[in-house]
């Protein structure tokens, strides 16, 4: 038998009558993720997704790394299947974990029996396998309290499986089970993290980016597309709709009070994002807004910003401080790209003294001089669609 991958399910197992649809979606997501790594058989049994190579050309290491980023999976391990026979299990453990046993100074064996018809109890199996391994690798001591290596034996309905420590999975729910949302993606640290957090709840994302040439460069746009590519392994395939925003910002600067520049700009972003959401049948908007980080993120300012839409505005970063956001940005691999020093449309025409506690009626009055619908129509008509795949 050949090495394979075991993906342990998380919240999916709690879904009751809907569980099968969640498992089907998760298997489809895993299949999509490992497709470029070779020809694999994907199937689900006993709260586990099995990823089994069909031939020797499969890149199981690449598939393993891909599985770790699939939402819905809490743990991933490479394992060697074998017959449900004690001597076969011992032989498999000696062969499969030989390098780990030689490198470790201590070990223990943990056994689990999903198949209760197996002749030995979990403790008895651990004792027999542990004794045989210690005899084969005498420099590796048995330590059941603080081992350097844990050898796992799983007795399941179809086979026994031998593996070392599992690695952490992405958690969450399978992409596609939580509906569709439109995420406002800028070039900063926050919006990629907020997109990741919403995708983790099973939401498929459509991205919108606002681009303001010549005030923002092509390099700034490419930076955002690079961020989207970094999100794809987590969030799945997506389309980034690049919306030209220059005319809107120039009209705001010409016709509106400076203290409201940022607020009115963000109200336009929300209006356009809702238009996009209506087109792609999304049920929510997602932003990287926090509470109190900048002048436009006070409670009063957030209220003014979302006044122009009727969809829910999801702000997953609202309770996090900057250090937590940066830490998560590093984890998902977007931080180094996010801090590249390129312009962003949010920094264009920044007011010197922004209003931190704006009055909604004053803001509505300030933007009344603008041809709101005409500006939005022209921006929507000139969008660029960039499709990003694995």
Question: For each of these PLM feature ranges, what is it?
Answer:
Residues 228-255, 344:
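A conserved beta-strand->alpha-helix junction
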Residues 333-341:
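A short alpha-helix-loop-beta-strand transition element characteristic
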Residues 183, 207-209, 242, 287, ...:
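Structural beta-sheet core signal
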Residues 293, 341-349:
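Small/polar glycine-rich anion-binding or flexible loop at a beta-alpha turn
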Residues 188:
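Conserved G/P- and acidic residue-centered "switch" motifs that form tight phosphate/ATP-binding loops
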Residues 1-182, 192-238, 307, 355-360, ...:
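RNA-binding accessory domains that recognize and position tRNA/RNA substrates
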Residues 128-133, 166, 171-178, 245, ...:
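Active-site adenylate/phosphate-handling loop in enzymes that bind or generate adenylated species
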């Amino acid at each position: 038998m050949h090495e394979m991958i075991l993906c342990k399910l998380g919240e999916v197992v709690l879904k009751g009558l809907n569980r099968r649809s969640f498992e089907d979606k998760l298997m489809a997501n895993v299949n999509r993720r490992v497709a470029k790594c070779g020809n694999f058989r994907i199937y689900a049994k006993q709260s586990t997704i099995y990823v089994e190579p069909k031939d020797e050309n499969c890149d199981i290491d690449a598939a393993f790394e891909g599985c770790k980023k699939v939402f819905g999976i809490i743990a991933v391990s490479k394992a060697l299947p074998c017959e449900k026979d004690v001597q076969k299990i011992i032989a498999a453990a000696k062969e499969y974990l030989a390098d780990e046993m030689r490198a470790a100074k201590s070990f223990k064996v943990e056994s689990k029996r999903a198949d209760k018809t197996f002749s030995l109890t979990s403790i008895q199996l651990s004792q027999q396998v542990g004794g045989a391994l210690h005899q084969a690798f005498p420099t590796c001591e048995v330590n059941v309290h603080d081992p350097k290596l844990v050898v796992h034996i799983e007795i399941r309905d179809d086979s026994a499986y031998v593996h070392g420590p599992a690695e952490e999975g992405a958690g969450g729910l399978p992409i596609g089970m939580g509906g569709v949302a439109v995420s406002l993606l800028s070039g900063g640290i926050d919006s990629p993290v907020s997109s990741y957090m919403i995708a983790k709840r099973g939401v498929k994302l459509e991205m919108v980016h606002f681009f303001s040439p010549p005030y923002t460069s092509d390099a700034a746009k490419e930076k955002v597309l690079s961020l989207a590519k970094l999100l794809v392994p987590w969030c799945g395939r997506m389309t980034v709709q690049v919306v030209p925003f220059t005319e809107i910002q120039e009209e705001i600067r010409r016709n509106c009070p400076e203290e409201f520049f940022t607020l009115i700009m963000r109200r336009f972003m929300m209006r356009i994002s809702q238009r996009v959401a209506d087109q792609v049948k999304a049920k929510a908007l997602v932003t990287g807004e926090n509470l109190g980080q900048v002048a436009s993120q006070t409670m009063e300012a957030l209220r003014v910003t979302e006044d122009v839409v009727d969809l829910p505005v999801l702000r997953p970063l609202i309770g996090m401080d900057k250090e937590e956001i940066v830490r998560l940005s590093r984890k998902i691999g977007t931080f180094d790209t996010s801090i590249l020093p390129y312009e962003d449309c949010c920094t264009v025409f920044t007011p010197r003294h922004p209003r931190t506690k704006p009055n909604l009626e004053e803001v509505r009055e300030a933007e009344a001089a603008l041809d709101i619908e005409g500006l939005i129509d022209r921006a929507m008509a000139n969008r660029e669609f960039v499709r990003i795949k694995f």
